[in-house]
Amino acid sequence: MTYWVWSLTASLSRDSVAPALSLQQQEKAVLAAPALPPSLQPVLAGVDPSEQLLKTLLEVPLDRLDDRQRLLLAALTRDQAERVAALALPLETQDLEPLQRALATAEPSTTLSDAHEQLLQNPALDPLLRQLSCEALGGSRDRCTNPEDADAAVGASQRLLLAQLFPIGALLIGVVLLLRDLWMRWRRALPAWPPLLGPLLSPVEITILVAGGFVLLGGVVLPVLVSPVIEVLFLGQPGGLGQAIGVLLSYITMAIPPLVILRSQLGALPDDNVPDGGWLQWRLQPWGRALLQGGRGWLMVMPPVVFTGWLMGRLVGDPGGSNPLLEMVLRSDNPLALVLLALTAVVLAPLFEEVVFRGVVLPVLARALGRGWGVFLSGLVFAVAHLSIGELPPLLVLGMGLALLRLSTGRLLPCVVMHACWNAATFLNLILLGS
């Protein structure tokens, strides 16, 4: 308990991914604007996406902006003091230093000099930075629009469109399904839930599983022993690959102790009491129905989770403490790194967490305290285990939704599918808006 309280408190000092995500979305909007139909531009990119990007950049402390973002700020702003401040910090990327000097010494002009035009051919400049810097150095909008960058604008418009329409569409479908389910439940038109079967463990045994295996051994002891080795072996890999390998190996290391303890606990139970489908009630067949149940559960849980996150933002703002993996995905441009991060988030995390929280914790607590308390407490433990106080309320709602799916289907596989769908949707959105 002390470890979780300390970790939750410490999560407040971690940066939130929200500002970085907002910046990426605004950058995509500026780049995509020329390729969007005029009727869609105000909806997808805003009336003045460049002004919105500048506003978003100014909301982030300069020391949290990377080299490229500070140059974007200097190129966009018309305030000399803001430009000087943005260009004052030294750059870590040497290839961008000529552009930094050009923006720092540029005088107000209506023409782009030949020297500046040559400077903008630097391959280190991406299409958006090249275009905005060109305009800041005196080039006209037409002259600064590079035909070779047209494909980048079209690609950005497609990613922006998908990143906005996909969650909105899923949210609307979820609202319809949720209202339909509530209506049918009120009319008593839904079938009764099956009996809740699970391991015949005691609350003390699941405390040993979670506190001893998950927290102490998996969260404290093994990371202290393994993390230095992982860091030495893989941290120097390019493009975030070392971080992705570290995340994957760290997650596997964290999962091993509780799974070993769980196997020992289940092995000690009498064989003649094992229910059909096993202690964890995987019930893999029919797998097609499990996919449908999991996908439907994901759509139905989205409205309450999104509403909870929105309400938290309105009441307390953004407290920070996002999962560091989110920003890794957002900034990574290494395909193999993204594959490893996806394997961790979309495959390993749903499998391990559903085994522990919906396969064991929920049935034991529901048998000891009743289904209502079992749903709430298993969801609370699930939320706290993510060690992010800012994301705790939405994760609590998500955990309760997963618990209700386990109760309504009597199977664990749909919960894994639902959890994987949630993580995959988040992952996809980050890739669409990321590097």
Question: What do the PLM-derived regions correspond to, one by one?
Answer:
Residues M1-D271, L430-S435:
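N-terminal, membrane-interfacial amphipathic/helix-forming hydrophobic leader that caps
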Residues G169, I173, A211-V220, V247-I256, ...:
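Alpha-helical transmembrane spans of integral membrane proteins, capturing the lipid-embedded, hydrophobic core
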Residues V221-I230, T253, P257-I261, Q265, ...:
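Alpha-helical membrane-inserting segments
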Residues R289, P303, V355-G374, L407-R411:
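Membrane-interface helix/loop boundary segments of multi-pass membrane proteins
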Residues G372-S435:
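Functionally important transmembrane alpha-helices
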